[in-house]
Amino acid sequence: RLNLPADAEFNQLSGGMKRRVLLGMALVAEPDLLLLDEPTNHLDIESIIWLEEFLQQFKGSLLFISHDRSFLKSLATRIIDLDRGKLTSWPGSYERYLEAKQAQLEVESTHNALFDKKLALEEVWIRQGIKARRTRNEGRVRALEQLRRDRSDRRELQGRVKLVTQKSEKSGKIVINAEAVKFQFEDKTIVNNFTFKMLRGEKIGIIGPNGCGKSTLIKLLLGKLAPQEGDIQLGTKLEAAYFDQHRETLDLEKSVRDNLVEKSDHVEVNGVSKHVISYLKDFLFSEKKINMPVKALSGGERNRLLLARLFTRSFNFLVMDEPTNDLDMDTLELLEELLVDFKGSLLLVSHDRNFIDNTVTSTLVFEGDGEVNEYVGGYVDWLRQRTTTNESAQAINSKVKSKSKPAQAPKPQPKPKVKLSAADEKDLRLIPIK
């Protein structure tokens, strides 16, 4: 169910496949306590659903880290929140946690505002100097010193990534037009007789099992691969940008700064020159991290660097291949908001069901043997349409079967027995028999 190649050497597997092997080892061990760190990364949707169902039946205790909101909603019965060095346990579902956390932050904000107001008033009092000393209110001075210490120790909420797209010229009305496309790799058919039209402003998701050819389809649609049959035409005035799930466009030996811009201290954002350090701070990189080699970064930091570099460019057609891998929840939600507001066209490959549901207008689904179909809406909409289609097909099949059977003559119904009254029976016995 994890789509693992049984005979492959572990050392020859990709990072994603190695994660799957380790996940499989953890599951078959049947431990009392199972610890999972981002288990849905690099899994396809089918595998994630299977994992959810498996873990729902798991008899032991489960402690997991995840940014996958659908996964959290399905499994979590308690949320442990690490915020500014403090662990807080929130009983209940993920949805209840979100509500309670928001309420706590609002209370904290009100408390901090009152605290800061009091501190400001006390600072005014102490600056009065001679007047303050004359009062000889040493207790008030000590209280002020404690207020200063408390303010110094306060840890503010971490800043949020600032995502802004560059202004770009509108593309032509038709972005992609594909007619009867076929592409085969060795003995495997990726797409067969695939016809598809994408219009300006549409946001289209792509889902399917791992290895089905989602990335290959993107390369076909972008003109990086030529179809073996059929034709693909790209629209006019397209400025395309590609977010690569493998992060192959990053130079691991170079620093964060040099991966963003070389031989320059500034980037241009919507016509405004901005210093590299200031720009990277918008993506939560400290000055220390900015000069570190990319190979020392975490997966989430590399993703943020790719986003930082992506948004230095202008584009009206954005292609994103698994952008949510390793992203923290805040950045993921900000990216989601940006894509919803994006005025251009979007092609999105993702295993994150919530992310797809919240961003796309229709979805291309790999359904086996090179068949790729388009459905209105996101993942949940596809499930609903698929269920309706299956029910309709079953209804049609049952009608066909009933019509194919010869009609049988109805069995004669026995006549109902008439019960006579005692007087009638007596009269009947008096009738002479001839």
Question: Where do the PLM segments sit?
Answer:
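ABC ATP-binding cassette signature C-motif
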Residues: R1-N112, L163-K434
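Transmembrane helical bundles of ABC transporters
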Residues: P5, R136-G139
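An intracellular "coupling" helix at the cytosolic face of ABC transporter transmembrane type-1 domains
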Residues: Y97, V107, K118, R136, ...
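Alpha-helical coiled-coil heptad-repeat register
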Residues: S109, D116, A120-E123, R127, ...
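Alpha-helical coupling/stalk and coiled-coil linker elements that connect catalytic or binding modules
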Residues: E122-K131, E145-Q146, V161-S168, V175-N177
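ABC transporter TMD-NBD coupling linker
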Residues: R140-V161, K203
